[in-house]
Design a protein with these regions (language model features):
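Conserved nucleotide-sensing/catalytic segment adjacent to the nucleotide-binding pocket
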Residues: 154-196
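P-loop NTPase catalytic core of nucleic-acid-dependent motor ATPases
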Residues: 31-32, 38-160, 231-234, 266, ...
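Structural recognition of the conserved hydrophobic beta-strand(s) that form the central parallel beta-sheet
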Residues: 165-166, 205-212
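N-terminal nucleic-acid engagement/recognition segments and initiation subdomains in replication
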Residues: 1-81, 85, 156, 172, ...
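Positively charged interface segments
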Residues: 2, 9, 135-138, 142-153, ...
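Alpha-helical scaffold elements adjacent to nucleotide-binding pockets in ATP/GTP-utilizing enzyme cores
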Residues: 127-130, 161, 175-183, 225-229, ...
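Phosphate-handling catalytic cores of nucleic-acid transaction enzymes
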Residues: 256-298
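Short coil/turn segments at secondary-structure boundaries
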Residues: 15-18, 29-39, 94-99, 112-115, ...
Length: 391
């Protein structure tokens, strides 16, 4: 050990080369060959066939052990009650279980990230903690999506986990779209490791994030790419600071028996997903877009509902920001500074501020658009109501 600590980079390369020449190296194809086999405390579950066996072969290449038992006699009624309190809708609970099932079985083509959206104190963090308890602490990482996208060394370090939880989604997380798309789809990466060796890998790690609010996606193509690869659960029941609050809510009910029953359920569910090649409730990008527009794309909604474009039109930036402030108050949108608003507005519309002169006054304007007046806003609202009625 002391020799390794004092060794130089060249020495470590020699050691690495010696190990590579004298030992069998596990390759990606070896991992993928046995990826459907899940190692538990009491045996192996084959997701493809739905069969459980207490025997284990040394030929299996399995990177993760689930720290629970496969036991069809166990139930998880206590945990289910808590799930029902955080996610009252059956469809949302099933989506959560389906996502955990995909964490157990990568490379199936059933690829998406899961977000849990809701105000503070609604149990989002508890869902993340419980996902970690189900899959096992050693199989779950907690890096931000932004860091995963930017740090190749971190990518290799967490590539073969079952799940990564980003506990607080940030605007930077949704900017790294190229890496995010590849990671969610579990495509091949090539990154340089320490000692200058490049490594090819396909991540098995699914992504999960928590958010109080979503963020503005300024590019329409980027937005569609995220909608197609994301499902969102909504946690809306407030617990923190109320009589319903229970600290570490899962601790008392998450007994070994309950966890065994839940893991057994999720494993069997993963077999169903594999056989059907889809989740119970397939991802609907239009639904995700609707949620994102409501909880994130506020400025885009303002532009769509309060402005109109035209080559000969222009609007003074000061009046535009005042209109946004009124819109934000009316629709309970998060506040933005002038600079934040102008940057997002320009990214979305492609318009740039220009200085113009009117009589003796100089002012900043956006050319090519104007604000709607009150009658136009009312008429547009009536037209949308008619569209809903027609549907």
């Amino acid at each position: 050990r002391q020799c390794l600590i004092k060794s130089t980079n060249g020495t470590m390369k020699e050691i690495h080369g010696h190990i590579k020449d004298s030992a069998d190296i596990i390759k990606n194809k070896d991992i993928e060959k046995h990826i459907h086999l899940k190692c538990l405390e009491n045996g192996i579950y084959n997701i493809k066939t739905g069969e459980f066996s207490e025997s284990f072969s040394s030929e299996y290449i399995i990177l993760n052990q689930i720290p629970h038992r496969f036991d069809e006699s166990c139930t998880f009624d206590g945990c289910q009650k808590i799930f029902c309190s955080i996610l009252p809708e059956k469809q949302q609970r099933q989506k959560f279980f389906d996502f955990l099932s995909t964490c157990l079985h990568p490379y199936t083509g059933i690829d998406f990230q899961l977000g849990v959206l809701g105000p503070p104190g609604t149990g989002k963090t508890q869902l993340g903690k419980f996902a970690e308890k189900i899959l096992g602490e050693d199989n779950v990482s907690h890096a931000t999506i932004h860091r995963i996208a930017m740090d190749p060394t971190l990518q290799i370090g967490i590539a073969y986990q079952m799940l990564n939880i980003d506990g607080d989604l940030s605007p930077e997380d949704i900017e790294q779209l190229d890496v995010l798309k590849k990671w969610i789809s579990q495509e091949k990466f090539t990154n340089r490791k320490i000692y200058n060796y490049a490594e090819n890998f396909r991540p098995t790690t699914r992504l999960m994030f928590m958010a109080n609010d979503l963020y503005e996606i300024t590019n329409e193509n980027d937005a569609e790419a995220i909608y197609e690869r994301t499902d969102i659960l909504k946690a809306e029941q407030k617990f923190r600071g109320t009589q319903k609050e229970i600290k570490n809510i899962f601790e008392d009910v998450a007994t070994e028996s309950e966890l065994d029953g839940l893991v057994t359920h999720i494993l069997k569910n993963s077999t169903i997903l594999y056989q059907k090649q889809k989740t119970t409730y397939p991802l609907d990008p239009r639904h995700v877009k609707g949620i994102w527009n409501r909880f994130g794309n506020w400025i885009r909604q303002f532009i769509d509902n309060r402005t109109v474009e035209g080559a000969s039109l222009q609007i003074e930036t000061r009046l535009l920001f005042e209109a946004w402030e009124n819109y934000a108050i009316t629709h309970s949108c998060p506040a933005k500074t002038k600079n934040e608003f102008y940057k997002l507005f320009e990214d979305i519309t492609g318009h740039q501020r220009t200085r113009t002169r009117e009589d003796t006054l100089s002012k900043w304007v956006y050319k090519g658009m104007r604000l709607l007046d009150e009658k136009e806003i009312e008429a547009a609202g009536q037209a949308k109501l008619k569209e809903v009625d027609d549907c």
